[in-house]
Structures are given as C-alpha cells and as structure tokens.
C-alpha cells in the first residue's frame, strides 16, 4: 500500500492566525475541499465529553468545521451514539443535555446536534462486512444514513485500547448500544483474588451493580449483570480487576477496526485529530487526569490508520510533562523518554494490533508522510 499523507500544524499562533484559523488552513491544505459536499448530509463524529471531563474537543472547533462544510455546500450535523454504561450519555435526552452542558448546541456549534442511535440506542443499521470478528456491525442510523463522514478526534490514552484516536472514535463511537455490547461481549473482566485489596472502589463505581465484596472481603463479579465496559479495570489501582481470560485488548481493537470499516464503507471520509490535553484515559470518564505530554498540535488525513499512527508516534517521541501526571509521578520517570507511553500507562493493552488489523482489512496504511502546514 502506498504511503499516506498526514498533515500537521503546531499550536503557535499570531494575532492574524488563531487556532481556529490554523485548523481551517490545515484541513484545506489536506484536501478536504476535494470531496463533493454539495447537498450532502455530513456526519461530524465527535465525542461531547462526559460532564465533569474537560479534555474533550472545544465546541469552537466543531463550529468552525460546520461553517466550513456549509460553505462547501454540505448539510452538516454533529453526532455521537449513546453509551453502553449508564452514565449521563446513555440515552438521547441525557446525552443532549450533557452535550449542551459542555457547550455543544445548534447555536454554538453552527449546526444541529443529533444522537445517532436514537432515544434508547435502538435505532441502527446493520452493515454487512463479513469481518473476521464482526459480520454485520450495528451502526447508529443517523451515521449509517449520512452521505459523508468527518471525524473530529481527541487523541488521548485509553484503558482498554491503549489510546483513543480516529479508529476508536469511529469504531466504538458510531456503534449503537447493541453494537457496543457486541464489541465488549468477550471482554468481561475478572478479579485477581491475590491482588484485590477489598478497597470497594469498583463496587462503588460499577454502574450496573455487577460487583460486590464477598465474605472474604474480595470483589466478585456477577456476570449476569456485567456488560464488559471495563471501568473496574481502569479504576483498580492494585491490578485486582483485569481483562478476562480468553480475551485481550487485541481482540477489542480488531473489532473496533471492523466497525470502523462498516462506518466508512462506500463513503467519502476525512479525519482530524487534536493532540491536546493528552489525558491517560477516555473522555467517557467524568474527570480527566493531567496530560502526560505537552499539547502538540492538530493533524488531518484521509487515512484514519495513518493518522492514528502519526499521532501515536508524536506522543511517544514527546517529552513527558515534568510534574503532576501519571508518568512523571512514576519512579525513575526520567528514563521513560521515548518509551511507549500508552503501554506504560495500560500494560494490558496493545494498540499496535488494532492498526495492523485495520491495515489488513484495507482501512489504510501505517506508512505515512508527515507534512507540516
């Protein structure tokens, strides 16, 4: 496969060129205007952020993108699907309220905001791809029915996939609630009894009441209630909750790649990633821990695989923030420069496997040329 072009701009500004201007210049240079947007419904896939989390992409960027697309003749809308876990984005009413709380509304975003899989997450299209792991991914109807897909991705760490970028935003984010259940279906966690301290944090934070402490003061999971969302794995500071046997981060990343293929199949698509506020974990949490590296910039490409690889490489090469974050607080952190920061934070994950599978199924290539704008 040929090398893909990934365009990048840093975050330096001048009075005549602010960050919104730089983003617009970046995507134009990357060729977004080569897509025929005339009278096309364009889904701008973005994560609205769980209330309390402040690392999500600012709505100002979404508004500038919507205005640019409308000027190109498009009918854009911001969109995301409901969550599997029962937080404040698990149904369309709460999800829209959360989006508005975080600044996403038709006035600020310059376009409508649509929850793609409907009120209760039951509105979806099955898109047949005959994948190795997913035969017919369940994609939110508003996304499946859109003519063009634009992803706006906050690049950060992720407790189950290593990092979250374009593939995660598209593959997991565009899945309906039932689709997310399929993605997580083989990834129910387990309790390592020897490591469990009985601290009760997983019990307190399980939104499905699937965990309790037994008579030995050890956590136990009720697999009849567990949906495999993995929040207990992310919360546990003692490696007491871990990925289940017979399942791996690799398998989840494989499925995400195949869901991404379903989302993009047969449609023009373009992707922008914001390498800012690179927090250790997903924006689905109601908090965001301190960034692990300095803010780096914005990148764009027609190839989501190349884009994710370029962003990962930049974060790995970047210096660790000097103080006050998960990596700088680690012993001997001065020796971690140039190491795989995602694996350091989440040692049970393997983000490389997802990119390899995405490449295998034709989503793009990991070979890229980085062009600075």
Residue ranges, per PLM feature:
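Extended, low-polarity segments enriched in aliphatic/aromatic residues
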Residues: 2-53, 57-61, 67, 72-80, ...
């Amino acid at each position: 496969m040929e090398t893909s072009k990934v365009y990048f701009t840093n975050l330096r500004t001048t009075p005549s060129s602010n960050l919104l201007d730089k983003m617009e210049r970046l995507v134009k240079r990357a060729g977004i205007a080569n897509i025929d947007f005339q009278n096309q419904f364009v889904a701008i896939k973005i994560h609205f952020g769980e209330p309390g989390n402040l690392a999500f992409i600012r709505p100002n960027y979404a508004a500038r993108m919507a205005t640019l697309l409308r000027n190109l003749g498009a009918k854009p809308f911001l969109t995301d699907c409901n969550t599997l876990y029962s937080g404040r984005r698990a149904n369309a009413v709460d999800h829209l309220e959360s989006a508005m709380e975080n600044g996403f509304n038709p006035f600020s975003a310059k376009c409508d905001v649509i929850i793609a899989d409907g009120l209760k997450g039951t509105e979806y299209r099955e898109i047949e791809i005959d994948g190795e792991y997913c035969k017919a991914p369940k994609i939110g109807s508003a996304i499946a029915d859109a003519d063009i897909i634009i992803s706006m991705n906050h690049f950060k760490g992720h407790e189950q996939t290593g990092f979250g970028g374009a593939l995660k935003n598209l593959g997991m984010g565009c899945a309906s609630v039932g689709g997310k259940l399929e993605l997580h279906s083989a990834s129910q966690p387990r309790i390592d009894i020897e490591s469990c301290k009985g601290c009760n944090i997983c019990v307190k934070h399980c939104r499905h009441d699937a965990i309790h402490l037994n008579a030995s003061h050890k956590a136990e999971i009720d697999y009849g209630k567990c949906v495999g969302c993995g929040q207990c794995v992310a919360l546990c500071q003692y490696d007491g909750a871990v990925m289940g046997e017979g399942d791996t981060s690799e398998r989840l990343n494989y499925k995400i790649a195949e869901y991404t293929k379903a989302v993009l199949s047969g449609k023009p698509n373009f992707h922008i990633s914001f390498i800012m506020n690179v927090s250790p974990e997903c924006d689905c949490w109601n908090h965001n821990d301190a960034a692990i590296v300095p803010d780096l910039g914005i990148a764009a490409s027609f190839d989501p695989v190349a884009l994710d690889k370029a962003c990962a490489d930049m974060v790995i090469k970047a210096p660790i923030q000097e103080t006050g974050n998960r990596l700088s607080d680690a012993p001997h952190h001065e020796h971690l420069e140039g190491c795989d920061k995602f694996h350091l934070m989440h040692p049970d994950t393997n983000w490389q496997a997802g990119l390899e599978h995405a490449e295998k199924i034709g989503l793009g290539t990991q070979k890229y040329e980085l062009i600075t704008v």
